[in-house]
Regions:
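Alpha-helical scaffold segments that flank or form the walls of functional sites
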Residues: 75-141, 163-176, 425-436
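Active-site gating loops and adjacent loop-to-helix segments of metal-dependent hydrolytic enzymes
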Residues: 73-105, 112, 139-161, 220-247, ...
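Active-site glycine- and acidic-residue-rich loops that bind
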Residues: 123-126, 184-200, 279-281, 350-352
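Divalent metal-coordination and catalytic microenvironments
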Residues: 9, 26, 31, 55, ...
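Active-site microenvironment of metallo-dependent hydrolases
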Residues: 1-24, 28-29, 341-444
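Metal-coordinating catalytic core of metallo-dependent amide/deamination hydrolases
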Residues: 131-254
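His/Asp/Glu-enriched, well-ordered alpha-helical/loop segment
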Residues: 240-247, 289-374, 390-391
């Protein structure tokens, strides 16, 4: 295991006191932060790598709590459409032509983008997840992986998948990659999956000792349909089935009542917020302040590149706080330090990496460095505000995961970026250039 010393760096710790340390040192031994501030005199002599932190700001790495990483192949393919047509005319059609190899290269392209933007871990929800797990192993990132399943029969599933097949994936990959790969079950949503199928998925999750990741309450139409079919909101419906009795990531939760929010809080459900997708598809902006006030674990996600077009948690943080400040007519809500916690430790807890998301002795060494020697990041009155409101993803120039450097001075160390760019684009053009067919239909 290697030893890394980051010298003379400013650090946003995101600890309980929200300490910001100036001109400090961070010592990493193996996977763990072993010193913050004063470092043992002989550590520098024994260090395998010394990083000059002058003009840099360190903070915990970002966690993407909801993404469809291989959809990077569909970036720019489904533009300027409402949600139903976006799914029915573009996304679910293109997915009928996907291959396992497409998934690998799409996930690899996404991994390049995520590492470059300071994302150290992601919760992925897509198909052929063995291929995504391969990318996680090779890249050095962390992930919570869910194989998406609809429960509509093999002819309506990508790759003719089944719940049994997704269970086998869980058993193969849980805690692989030296603990960096975690798994969960991925029934798509209560508006696609029947109550019987959701109950089967829940029982299997309990048997396997894992959680569930699904989409919840993305539109008013979904809520109305749930009330008509089940007599309950989507959140209440899932709670009545017992789905929230296992660790649950309920992506979006845009249309939730006060009673729904109470359920989410009481069941410790994570609600990832993906604002750029909501804006692009004109879906709404959600009730983030109300959920946080009630104690819901709101984390940040990006959703897939087909609806967001980028995989940038910093952008999600910025849009979330700006939209909610404007919606609530309250400039004091969701301050920068809180947004950084949503982007880091809230996601870390949701993905099962609770020992990350903070800079302190004993925490996992998941650290990113922003290069602050830039005009748009000076002066440094408020480092957290500079990052949330001024920084770009391209300002990240070091990424460390479990004590391993994945990005050094802006260069990827674990992935062949040139080859990935070439192969991913070739496969993306092939994907949309062949015969495709709708394999299921989204109905309001």
């Amino acid at each position: 295991m290697s030893r890394i010393l980051i010298r003379n760096v400013d650090a946003i710790t995101l600890d309980e006191q929200n300490r910001v340390l100036k001109n400090t040192n961070i010592a990493i031994d193996g996977k763990t932060i072993v010193a913050l501030g004063d470092v043992p005199r002989d550590f520098a002599e024994r260090a395998d790598e010394i990083i000059d932190g002058r003009d840099h700001v360190a903070l915990p790495g970002f966690f993407n709590a909801h993404v469809h990483a291989p959809m990077s192949l569909q970036r720019g393919w489904a533009e300027d459409l409402p949600f139903d047509r976006w799914l029915n005319e573009r996304i679910w059609v293109a997915e009928s032509a996907l291959t396992e190899e497409d998934i690998y290269w799409g996930a690899a392209l996404a991994a390049c983008e995520m590492i470059r933007s300071g994302i150290v871990a992601f919760a992925d929800h897509y198909f052929w997840m063995d291929q995504v797990a391969r990318v996680v192993e090779e890249s050095g990132m962390k992930a919570l992986l869910a194989w998406c399943i609809f429960g509509l029969g093999a002819d309506k599933e990508v790759g003719r998948a089944s719940l049994e097949r997704t269970e086998e994936f869980v058993e193969r990959w849980q805690n692989a990659g030296d603990g960096r790969v975690k798994t969960t079950l991925g029934p798509h949503s209560p508006y696609i999956c029947s109550p019987q199928f959701l109950t089967r998925a829940l029982n299997d999750a309990v048997k396997l000792g894992v959680g569930i990741h699904l989409h919840v309450a993305e539109s008013q139409a979904q809520v109305a349909r749930s009330l008509k079919e089940h007599g309950k909101t989507p959140v209440a419906h899932l709670a009545s089935l017992g789905v929230f009795d296992v660790p649950t990531i309920a992506a979006h939760c845009l249309y939730v009542s006060d009673d729904d929010i109470a359920i989410l809080a009481d069941k410790r459900v994570t609600a990832p917020h993906c604002p750029k997708t909501y804006l692009k598809l004109a879906m709404g902006i959600g009730r983030v302040p109300a959920m946080l006030a009630r104690g819901v674990n709101v984390a940040l996600g990006t959703d897939g590149p087909a609806s967001n077009n980028t995989i940038d948690i910093l952008e999600s943080a910025r849009l979330t706080t700006l939209l909610q400040k404007n919606e609530q007519r309250d400039p004091e809500i969701l301050p920068s330090m809180q947004m950084l916690k949503l982007a880091t430790q809230n996601g870390a807890w949701a993905l099962g990496f609770a020992d990350s998301g903070v800079l302190r002795v004993g925490a996992r060494a998941d650290v990113i460095l922003f290069d602050f020697a830039k005009p748009h990041l000076r002066p440094r009155h408020d480092l957290a505000a500079n990052i949330v409101h001024s920084a770009h993803a391209t300002d990240v120039d070091h990424v460390i995961v479990d004590g391993r450097v994945l990005l050094r001075k802006g260069k990827l160390t674990t992935l062949d970026e040139e080859r990935i760019l070439r192969e991913a684009e070739r496969r993306a053009f092939r994907l949309v250039g062949q015969e495709m067919r709708p394999i299921r239909e989204y109905q309001h």
